[in-house]
Amino acid sequence: MTDTTNNEAPRLDLSDVEHRVGKLVGGGQLWEPCAKSDIRRWVMAMDYVNPIHWDQKFASQTKFGDIVAPQSMAVALDYGHGCQPACVGRIPGSHLIFGGEEWWWYGTHIRPGDRLVQERRFAGYKVTDTKFAGPTMFSNGDTIHRNQHGNLVAKARSTAIRYLAAEAEKRGFDFVDV
């Protein structure tokens, strides 16, 4: 919420954010297991050329014995593509920009038939005064990806950037027409 009627500095109303720090957040889980066609479509979309991900004959001759997904497939098997745990709480008058992710993989490959399950947690936030929009919140969320056997596949930390839209517009950064 922006209140500058009394020459006060604009503030983010974080009352619906603060109590969520460190807590698990909900989110959907995919119903269907990963299929070979899902892996093939993902590698085509990402333009991966390694035949271990799409060529049945080639993959059968490798140590895996079958097609395996590239590590990045974990994001495609997550509801919300990993950003969701960083985007919690209502901040009146704010806009959100996805700020990216960092990933760590643990050697468990995603195979056809696997079901990934995610545990999501709002890790925390910091507020920084920016030239762009004044008070701007950088929030982080963590997602742990496990397969149906409980094996750790990947961890991801996502960042969301939230700012007061009216303050950004006042400062000349209006993204409505972009």
Predicted regions and their residues:
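HotDog/MaoC-like acyl-thioester-processing domains
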Residues: 1-18, 100, 105-178
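Hot-dog-fold acyl-thioester-processing enzymes
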Residues: 2-100, 171-178
